[in-house]
Structures are given as structure tokens and as C-alpha cells.
Amino acid sequence: MKKMSLWLLLLVIALPIAAQTEDENIEEKEDTASTDSSMVDSLTRDSLVLPWPQSVQHHIDMMLKSEMFKNSQVGLMIYDLDADSAIYRFNEHQLLRPASTMKVITAITAIDKLGGSYQFKTEMCYTGEVKDRTLNGDIYCIGGFDPRFNSDDLNAFIESIRKMGVDTIRGNLYADKSMKDSATMGEGWCWDDDNPVLSPLLISRKDVFMERFLKELRDAGVVVEATIGEKTKPEDAFCICTRFHTMDQILMKMLKESDNLYAESMFYQIASSTGNRPATAKSARAVIKRLINKIGLDPSRYNIADGSGLSLYNYVTAELEVMLLRYAYRNGNIYLHLFPALPIAGRDGTLKNRMRGSFTSGNVNAKTG
């Protein structure tokens, strides 16, 4: 049985409107009577005797009258998935910036389009021939925009070369970045923000892949008589190593920690799935719009700019996010991968130190904005 019978989404407040930064630290500290916990966990005597769903409606009415919301824009929709109907609506058609809840839209679209078994791949290939322990040819590192690619993966590349019996390379080391376009920032991003690097070939989140590759080869005792460049892999290249990370691995960090780089990687995987090369934000938006149309809403009403929510050009509604969550709930393959990746109130991710009261801790899976 699915764990949740009710999704509470979306409470959007105009400020703050920026998506959470990719390196946001979740403070490890005692959270005493935090505002959100006390608001959600304090049930009055009157609300305890009210029938469902009137008790929920009463509580939300009281919350919206609080000082917290006097100078804020709010879009709210509460949906009972068992009854398949909305039990509360407030400005649910109001266009608002989603901030990091945009990541939920990206995640649902990605699982729907790519499937839960999708892999984020990085390959290494070579041309030429090996003779007398020398590779007379070029090596290509083909980026697939895997945000988790790290030193262990790079070591696997180097070990593959050593297993060929190669101790000298006479040729060039090429980065193949043809998977996506050359845009380094998303549309509507603030130039002075701590933005992720939109490169399909990263190592440990940094755009220094080939420099690290060359250094690690030499540190491993391989003589490299080569220069570094950028070039698309030729058709006759022979691939000797592929490293990958799974959809679930990317989703976990993307949603639990609200990681912008992981969300943008997911966004460009969506774009790449269309077959258009290079992958562009425009292609990803087209896929998201088709899904919006599929769930019965008009995609022209919304503005989708990026996958992370960093863009100030994103505008969506509470209704859209709830209807996408409904779609995810009713499609088992999406739900299976999405639900475990959402932060759990009082337990982990961006909700670890929030909603820690007895009614909410461990009982709410949600995405922060």
C-alpha cells in the first residue's frame, strides 16, 4: 500500500524566491520551538473534535490569517488522493516562482520520460592502435552530464588504460562535450549567484575534467606525449570504459539536499532524450510542456525556464504542482522512485531540522522551496 493518502502542496511564499544553493548546509543543531513545527503540530481543542476534512480546512484558515502571511503571496491546494478530489483551495491558479519546488516538476518529468532504470553515463574511448605498450592515437572522454562523476570513476578510466598494457600515449586527450549546448548558465539566473557549472563533463562538480585526467595519468606512471583539446568522438573509436550512476542516486541528492547541479543534469537528460543534439533547455521545456498537457492543463499558462528553480523566469501554480504529484501517485513507476527521494520531516535532507513535533516528524515527505 502506498504510504501517503494526502499530499499537501503547494504553499508558495514570494520571499525567499531563489532556489536553494547546491552547497546549502543543513545545520546540525537543536531545533526547539521552530515556527513551522509549532504551527503544524499545535492542534486546538476545537480542531480535534471537527470531522475530517473540516478540521484540515479550519486549521489552514487559521494559519493563513497569521502574521506570517500578511505580506506574502500564497498559492495553496490540498488534495485527498483517496477521494481523488481537492479539499482546500486558495489562490491555486496564481502564478508564482516555484524556487526549488521546480525540482519536483523536473523529477516527475524525468522519471516519466526516461524511466526509473535510466543511467547517467560517462565513457572513455580511443582511436589508433597499441604497439609495444604505446598507444599511437587519441583518447576521448565523452560527457553524459553525470553530476556524481568523481575520483573513483576517473581512477577506473586510468586502470582501463593500464589493463591494455599501455604505458605511453602519443596523441591527444579530447573532451567530447557534444551532449549539450555551450550554455554555461540557465536563462534567468543571477550572474552573482553560486550557480552550478552546466558542463556535460565534470569531475567532483568542477569543470576541470581533462586537466585532472592528464595529471592522474602521469601520476599513475603513464607517459603522456599529448595535448588536451575538445572534439567529438569519431564513429570508429573503440570504447573501453563506461561509468554510470543510477536515476535513484541522482534523485536522492537532487531532492533530499535540493542540489541544483543534479537538477540541471536531470533537466538536460530530459532534453537529450528527444534525440536533438546538442541537448538544450528548449528541448527539455518542450517535454515538460507535453506532460503538462497530458495531465489536462494548459502549458501556455506557465513559464518553465530551468530544471532547478534558480531562474527568476519560472512561473507555475499550486494547482500544476499538485496535479503533477497526483499523476506521479497514480503511476507506480514514478511514485516508486520519487517518494523515497523526498526529504522526511524531522529526519533528513532539507527538512531534518524542521517539523520535528510529534504529529509531523517522520510523517511528512515534502520538497522545500
Q: For the regions a protein language model found, what residue spans apply to each?
A:
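Bacterial Sec-dependent N-terminal signal peptides
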Residues: 1-26, 32, 37, 47
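Beta-lactamase-like hydrolase cores
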Residues: 24-82, 88-95, 159-165
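Second-shell loop/turn segments in exported
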Residues: 42-51, 89-98, 139-149, 158, ...
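Active-site SXXK
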Residues: 84, 98-116, 173, 212-217, ...
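Active-site-adjacent, His/Asp/Glu-enriched structural segments that form or flank metal-binding
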Residues: 116-181, 188-196, 202-203
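A small/polar active-site loop signature that marks catalytic segments
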Residues: 206-339
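Active-site Gly/Thr loop motif
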Residues: 293-298, 344-369
